[in-house]
Swiss-Prot record:
Glycyl lysine isopeptide (Lys-Gly) (interchain with G-Cter in SUMO2) crosslink, residue number(s): K590, K592, K624, K694, K839
One of the GO biological process terms: spermatogenesis
Gene3D superfamilies: 3.30.60.160, Transcription Factor, Ets-1
Disulfide bonds: none
Keyword list, A-Z: Developmental protein, DNA-binding, Isopeptide bond, Metal-binding, Nucleus, Phosphoprotein, Ubl conjugation, Zinc, Zinc-finger
Name of the gene encoding the protein in the UniProt record: Phc2
Record Pfam families: PHC2_SAM_assoc, SAM_1, zf-FCS_1
Role: Component of a Polycomb group (PcG) multiprotein PRC1-like complex, a complex class required to maintain the transcriptionally repressive state of many genes, including Hox genes, throughout development. PcG PRC1 complex acts via chromatin remodeling and modification of histones; it mediates monoubiquitination of histone H2A 'Lys-119', rendering chromatin heritably changed in its expressibility.
Region of interest: Interaction with BMI1: 33-56
Highest taxon above the source species: Eukaryota
Phenotype of gene-disrupted mutants: Mice are viable and fertile but show posterior transformations of the axial skeleton and premature senescence of mouse embryonic fibroblast associated with derepression of Hox cluster genes and Cdkn2a genes, respectively. Mice lacking Phc2 and Phc1 die at an early gestational stage. Mice mutant for Phc1 and/or Phc2 demonstrate that Phc1 and Phc2 mutations affect synergistically the survival of embryos in a gene dosage-dependent manner and thus show functional redundancy of Phc1 and Phc2.
Protein name: Polyhomeotic-like protein 2
Modified positions (Phosphoserine) in chain numbering: S613, S743
Amino acid sequence: MENELPVPHTSNRASVTTNTSGTNSSSGCISSSGGGGGSGGRPTAPQISVYSGIPDRQTVQVIQQALHRQPSTAAQYLQQMYAAQQQHLMLQTAALQQQHLSSAQLQSLAAVQQASLVANRQGSTPGSSVSSQAPAQSSSLNLAASPAAAQLINRAQSVNSAAASGLAQQAVLLGNTSSPALTASQAQMYLRAQMLIFTPTATVATVQPELCTGSPARPPTPAQVQNLTLRTQQTPAAAASGPPPTQPVLPSLALKPTPSSSQPLPAPPQGRTMAQGSPAGAKPSGTDNAPETLKAGDGNCNMEGRPGPGRAVPAVATHPLIAPAYAHLQSHQLLPQPPAKHPQPQFVAQQQPQPPRPAPQVQSQPQLASVSPSLALQSSPEDHALPLGSVTQALPLQCSTTHVHKPGNSQQCHLPTLDTGSQNGHPEGGSHPPQRRFQHTSAVILQVQPASPVTPQQCAPDDWKEVVPAEKSVPVARPGPSPHQQAIIPAIPGGLPGPKSPNIQQCPAHETGQGIVHALTDLSSPGMTSGNGNSASSIAGTAPQNGENKPPQAIVKPQILTHVIEGFVIQEGAEPFPVGRSSLLVGNLKKKYAQGFLPEKPPQQDHTTTTDSEMEEPYLQESKEEGTPLKLKCELCGRVDFAYKFKRSKRFCSMACAKRYNVGCTKRVGLFHSDRSKLQKAGTTTHNRRRASKASLPTLTKDTKKQPSGTVPLSVTAALQLAHSQEDSSRCSDNSSYEEPLSPISASSSTSRRRQGQRDLDLPDMHMRDLVGVGHHFLPSEPTKWNVEDVYEFIRSLPGCQEIAEEFRAQEIDGQALLLLKEDHLMSAMNIKLGPALKIYARISMLKDS
């Protein structure tokens, strides 16, 4: 599915009413539900009305309400389509001959080609003009417009199927063009692909004009799908006018249409209104033949009766097929198709209507598109058996050639021929991809089916390649593998190489001889690719890479899982990454070993170069060994815990404690006036110590603070303070070497701290007492009790803050407000510069701590 182009989702429902010259009975509403090949959620139902009064006069009037495409674009499309048709017809003939088709098959192909050419020319020239805002060119195309073309179609079922498939393709083209969502280039791709697929028939020409005429506004998929479905249905009807057995499947197809494909298929009352100008609206009169056949021919009301199954099989098949198929065709098949030009195989498939395997086909397919089974069945009187999936596959056979041309390989999925056999096995899984792939091909399938009852099962990518070599036999033999093959198809994108596998060999078992087979046989060869490659491509709707298109397949890299996690692209390797412990961890362990904490560890250090699991185990062991015997105490909060829970320097139980300790050290750095910092230190150091030990110390320090002159002996107070300051400063210096980022001040001034601690030791007791007394003389010991004047004095005493003190007084900041201040308050509200603000805030923090 990598290669699928996104297709706008629109309702799959298409209402097709076919008015045969004699009867309206076989009008069917084809609605495809989400079940079919991924086309199931389309909101809008494009409507197409095709009026083909009589076989002789088959006219399609398309009135488009709004043509979003520019006329020039439409004209270009038409020109491209015509050129492609001519090339394809020529290529088809050559390819069929190259494929060594049986003489009968070749003859039938020739007849089909002739009929298609006649139909195209007649349709384009005499055919009723298609009214479209698009270039005038588009208006002239009608496949079956002339009686001669109608006669040709009626005359040969294969011819009819070809013409019908052409119509279906036209519908596809219309759908693509009309889809507003599709870009012009995409539309071109669709057109090319369709033309290639259906080029054998004049219908291609008709399709082109339709494209132009089709209203671009319509969502591409729904309209296209509907058109395709209708056309496909029509085509099968015309082609399979003989065989009614398969009718049940195809509600709208009602393939049973009498051989006369000429019967008009006004059908699409639903959205088809010509006035609507829906893409479908552009149905070529030539197409009408197929619809006519559908509806009447046999009068099998398959179309009508089938509506119940919903999604007249053909239509539904087309829908699912078209939506996915278009995407594929766009990227893979459509563009390449013009080069490949393997449409010829189409005819081959058409030529062999003989093998009637109608019944099987219907059953299996219903799930897929519920419709497609019938489609396939009807397409060839004998080959109806193809399920929807098979239809898609069959289409590939006929159209496959077309598809293949696109990349040749990409689509080479050889529709391994949609024989009934395959229907059964993979109606569901297999058919979806094909449907998706070959929306256009659905019509083709009809054509192909006559050629071989061969099951379309060959969806399996493996079969595709093989089928080509097998040539004739390959497509037919598909039935057996079909179930799993189809299942494979969805997976194909991943590994197309599979298609090359022997599955194809199986095909020969069935009707290898038949035309379908030959078409598919030469997947690899350009001409053959159309047949084989197509089927494969349709099968691999998701992965339009045939065995031959392996390159398009998903490129298989060695198993590397790639994850996108929070914007990071993470690729998993086949082998574990060489993981080593973090340098910090390794450094710590080395220190421990050196210190002899863990004597048994050193041997384990060798594990650092070992695998992840080996590396983890020793560390866990270390942690356990450390944990049981080794417990550490936090230097700040006093908490005792296992050593492995202590971070980095193993001195603090948590980062919070480490940071708080660092803050304390920073405050004690000699940042401030020596007098002031010493005064402050007298209080702060005792506070820090008190907090660390939480014991009898608090009461002692409180006493010292409360008594200015010191009821407690001054020597005791001084000794405590000196000891604390010395210990704190040594802690700070120790901290700076182990702890993570200390503040620049604290990290850079461990020496100054040490010096200051030394100085404090030398200070006489009286000097310390004087400092304490001075501090308490100026300010109350509790900052919360300060008034505005106290705060003013405090700020004025800070270095460089004399001028700012007035601002504090003006703002009426008292002690409590002071403790609530933050740096931003100082800078934003009071317009204080950063330097003084930081100093003031540092002092406020110290006050809080005290």
